[in-house]
Regions:
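Alpha-helical multi-pass membrane segments and their bilayer interfacial helix-loop junctions
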Residues: 1-384
Length: 384
């Protein structure tokens, strides 16, 4: 089941978009106020520093609670059983605590989610050891249902990333059992990543997938990185040498021309996708992939001295950046050099904070007035 209140999440997103459109002049101040009134109920979302503090505090409470529970039960009961029961009890309380306090990735819930997953691991590894099968992918397969359940219920992005990597490890482990599997490993990893990307991208276009929006974004980005790494010549060649215990320098690999093609073709595909779908993630990954491709080529083939390569590369990048900036002074094809409104909003917030600090410095004689705070009392708010 979905633990978080999806209505609150949609209200939070609606307020964010309303503020953005107001900054862009698409909404008047009255319309912004009306939108914020309609979507007034939002989850608790403190600033980053408070999130970190709450995360550390919740983790400490979770570990102290588990230690206290184990001391109460005594040493006569299996640690894995006690840990698993503690995980179930914590999950039961968490499912009721989140709607009551209207949390969403506030630090407390993240810490307890990770704690619940960690508390189930001793029992899973005890089951794995009882099977007496010396295959790590079986342990990963036993963990996978827990991760899938947590991702479905909470949509936690870091757990979703762990789920993706867990499946990747299972696929790689199965293929590495024989020479043919090792030879097909790069293609299998690319297919795995491509399949994940296609499925999650189609899922992200469905209105019902809003609940998992952040997790899907993390999965998409990770799948794109793995897809490129699986086809990169440097990664394939060096991994082949490591897996087969070959001496340095690593020998040439089979289908070298194909992987050289992947090394340079995949970044161009990402760039094309970024332009085609106005996708910043694809565009940035395409640029980073181009840099990685050039470095890969430079690693195996010395064309110019390093100094000349850096000078010419920097000059070319500067000229390209200058030309693109000039062309995009006026928006073209959906692209613009204009700064992001979010950046302007952050700058405005920083200006307000600095002015408030300055005013406080010059008005110390008024005394300290407590009260009015939204978090922890004493006038301390949870956000600027």
């Amino acid at each position: 089941m979905k633990v978080y209140n999806e209505t609150l999440l949609r209200n939070e997103y609606a307020q964010k978009m309303a503020r953005k459109w107001h900054l862009e002049g698409m909404l008047t101040t009255e319309q912004l106020a009306e939108a914020q009134l309609i979507h007034a109920a939002v989850p608790y979302n403190p600033n980053l520093f408070i999130k970190i503090g709450l995360f550390v505090f919740a983790q400490a409470c979770f570990f102290f609670g588990g230690s206290f529970g184990f001391l109460l039960v005594g040493a006569g009961v299996s640690f894995s059983i006690v840990s698993f029961l503690y995980a179930i009890a914590t999950a039961f309380l968490l499912v009721r605590f989140i709607p009551q306090k209207q949390l969403h990735f506030s630090g407390i819930d993240n810490a307890l989610i990770y704690g619940v997953i960690g508390a189930t691991m001793p029992l899973i590894f005890e089951i794995y050891e009882s099977l007496k099968i010396d295959e790590l992918w079986i342990a990963a397969a036993l963990c996978l249902p827990i991760l899938v359940l947590v991702v479905y219920s909470f949509g936690e992005p870091l757990v979703a990333l762990g789920m993706f990597l867990c499946g990747l490890f299972i696929v790689a482990s199965l293929l590495m059992k024989n020479p043919i599997g090792k030879a097909l490993l790069p293609f299998a990893l690319m297919l795995y990543a491509a399949g994940f990307f296609i499925v999650t991208r189609k899922l992200s276009q469905q209105p019902t997938a809003f609940y998992w929006k952040t997790a899907i974004y993390w999965l998409n980005t990770t799948a794109l990185v793995v897809f490129y790494a699986g086809g990169n010549y440097f990664v394939v060649r060096e991994a082949n040498a490591q897996l087969n215990n070959l001496p340095a320098p690593s020998p040439e690999i089979a289908f070298a021309g194909l992987f050289w093609g992947f090394t340079f073709l995949i970044p161009f595909l990402y760039l094309y996708g970024g332009f085609r779908w106005r996708d910043r993630t694809l565009f940035v990954l395409g640029l980073l992939g181009m840099v990685a491709s050039v470095l890969t080529f430079r690693y195996y083939h010395t064309v110019l001295p390093v100094e000349w390569g850096m000078i010419l590369g920097g000059a070319a990048a500067t000229l390209v950046a200058f030309g693109v900036i000039r062309q995009l002074k006026m928006p073209k094809y959906g692209f613009s050099y204009a700064p992001e409104k979010d950046d302007e909003e952050r700058l405005a917030i920083e200006t307000i904070v600095v002015s408030q600090i300055t005013n406080n410095i010059h008005s110390v004689e008024n005394g300290v007035e407590f009260g009015g705070g939204d978090f922890a009392g004493g006038g301390a708010g949870e956000k600027y």
